[in-house]
């Protein structure tokens, strides 16, 4: 889970709260070679427990975990706004997560900036989004 960029096909809060990413936006984002596809788990806690992490991976097949995406996905879903999540993963969600976050926070920023610029260009030139 560390120092990578994930384009999330879905955001999973628990079995009842699963938000699918917009397929067109996800396809456009995943055209960038610096992005890997995955499932994003999300919750109201900083994931540092290895057993809890293993449980999320086994139950939901997640690639990464964060604390914000479910709220954003929920608002988008309720308002009918296409949703996509691109995440810079900064730690392995284990007992060393706090230290890893500090060390790796800037490692993927340039790549994420490039992915976003490329995605915005693809969105603006994608006929399927404008017709």
Across the structure, where does each feature detected by a protein language model lie?
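Single conserved hydrophobic/aromatic residue that forms the stacking wall/gate
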Residues: 1-7, 11-12
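Gly/Ser/Thr-rich active-site loops/lids in small-molecule metabolic enzymes
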Residues: 8, 61, 65, 105-112
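Active-site-adjacent substrate-binding region
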Residues: 22-90
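His/Asp/Glu-rich mid-to-C-terminal helical/loop segments that flank catalytic regions of hydrolases
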Residues: 93-131
């Amino acid at each position: 889970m560390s120092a990578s960029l994930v384009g999330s096909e879905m955001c999973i809060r628990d079995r009842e709260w699963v938000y699918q990413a917009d397929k067109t936006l996800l396809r456009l984002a995943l055209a960038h070679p610096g992005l890997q596809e995955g499932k994003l788990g999300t919750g109201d806690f900083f994931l540092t427990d290895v057993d809890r992490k293993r449980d999320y991976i086994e139950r939901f097949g997640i690639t990464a975990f964060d604390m914000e995406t479910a709220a954003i996905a929920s608002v988008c879903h309720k308002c009918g706004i296409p949703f996509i999540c691109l995440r810079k993963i900064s730690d392995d969600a284990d007992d060393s997560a706090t230290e890893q976050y500090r060390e790796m926070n800037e490692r993927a920023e340039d790549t994420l900036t490039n992915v976003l610029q490329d995605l915005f260009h693809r969105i603006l030139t994608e006929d399927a989004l404008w017709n």
